UniProtKB/Swiss-Prot annotation:
This is ATP synthase subunit b. The chain crosses the membrane at residues 11-31. Belongs to the ATPase B chain family. InterPro entries: ATP_synth_B-like_membr_sf (IPR028987), ATP_synth_b/b'su_bac/chlpt (IPR002146), ATP_synth_F0_bsu_bac (IPR005864), ATP_synthase_B_chain (IPR050059). It is found in: Cell inner membrane. F(1)F(0) ATP synthase produces ATP from ADP in the presence of a proton or sodium gradient. F-type ATPases consist of two structural domains, F(1) containing the extramembraneous catalytic core and F(0) containing the membrane proton channel, linked together by a central stalk and a peripheral stalk. During catalysis, ATP synthesis in the catalytic domain of F(1) is coupled via a rotary mechanism of the central stalk subunits to proton translocation. Its main location: membrane. It comes from Psychrobacter cryohalolentis (strain ATCC BAA-1226 / DSM 17306 / VKM B-2378 / K5). HAMAP family: ATP_synth_b_bprime. GO terms for cellular component: plasma membrane; proton-transporting ATP synthase complex. It comes from the Bacteria. Keywords: ATP synthesis, Cell inner membrane, Cell membrane, CF(0), Hydrogen ion transport, Ion transport, Membrane, Transmembrane, Transmembrane helix, Transport. Pfam families: ATP-synt_B. It is a single-pass membrane protein.
Length: 156
């Protein structure tokens, strides 16, 4: 066999093989490659969208956290103000009540002092009358009178 005829036969066989591959093998390979490219592009797009959604969600979460912190701080401040107001109200009520009790006690003490004075005056008057009666009943004697007045003074 001659090299030229072998070469031509091989070229014809190769051309038939290439046409067969282009007709039956190449379209499914190109379709698979295109599908794979499309899936990769969709995956990249989905990843970009998910990344953007994640950034948006993180920003929203941060805003919500900031808002919640602000609300919590406001609630705590309001609670502290209410607690302080309650303490101040209780203090003022306690002071008013203490002053009222002190005034009542002072009035009671004053009343008892007045009663004691009146009782003492009555006793002094009785003793003075008794002393005068004793002096008048006995004979008039300066030493005896002085001694009775000393006893009377001791009783007072």
């Amino acid at each position: 066999m001659n090299i030229n005829s072998t070469l031509i036969g091989q070229a014809i066989a190769f051309a038939i093989f290439v046409m067969f591959c282009m007709k039956f093998v190449w379209p499914p390979l190109i379709g698979a490659i295109n599908d794979r490219q499309r899936k990769i592009a969709e995956g990249l797009n989905a990843a970009e969208k998910a990344k953007a959604d994640l950034a948006t969600a993180e920003r929203d979460v941060q805003q919500e956290l900031d808002l919640a912190k602000t609300k919590a701080a406001a609630l705590i401040e309001q609670a502290n103000k209410s607690a302080n107001q309650l303490v101040e109200d209780a203090k003022s009520q306690a002071q008013v009540e203490g002053e009222r009790i002190r005034q009542q006690a002072q009035a009671s003490i004053d009343q008892e002092i007045n009663q004691a004075r009146e009782s003492l005056r009555a006793q002094v008057a009785e003793l003075a009358v008794l002393g005068a009666e004793k002096i008048l009943q006995d004979k008039v004697d300066v030493q005896k009178h002085a001694s009775m007045l000393d006893q009377l003074a001791a009783k007072l």
